[in-house]
């Protein structure tokens, strides 16, 4: 790989990492090509990106993106996305189905280094759409109760 190719990879990764709110670093030793492609498909379906990069290049890109404190050792695959919950759900689900061949090592969520346990906890949260639905339900509840009370009052007056 030439120096210009390395520079291009670093620039691309830096821009991608800066734009994302969640980055996960995982071990993929033992995955078959078919399994790895399944990971890429699952990630793509949830708006995440997956790439295997040399640790030195990824380390430079992460530092350029102000993601400091990550120790990159051994083989790593990087998965990143704007949606922390979708990313966490995708990689944890894949880790469960990969028979110990795919392991989540750590991540970088919203400016801080997180461990695999934190990523697993985030994966158990409701999805973004479910959270929005819950919030809307809470917001509309008072109006719904008010309308129900007025309707009951109307029915009561009609009976009398």
Swiss-Prot record:
Organism domain of life: Bacteria
Its job: Forms part of the ribosomal stalk, playing a central role in the interaction of the ribosome with GTP-bound translation factors.
Quaternary structure and interacting proteins, as annotated: Part of the ribosomal stalk of the 50S ribosomal subunit. The N-terminus interacts with L11 and the large rRNA to form the base of the stalk. The C-terminus forms an elongated spine to which L12 dimers bind in a sequential fashion forming a multimeric L10(L12)X complex.
Gene Ontology CC: ribonucleoprotein complex; ribosome
GO molecular function per UniProt: large ribosomal subunit rRNA binding
GO-annotated biological processes: translation
Protein name: Large ribosomal subunit protein uL10
Pfam name, any one: Ribosomal_L10
Recorded family membership: Belongs to the universal ribosomal protein uL10 family.
Listed Gene3D superfamilies: 3.30.70.1730
Keywords: Ribonucleoprotein, Ribosomal protein, RNA-binding, rRNA-binding
Signal sequence, start to end: none
NCBIfam families in alphabetical order: PRK00099.1-1
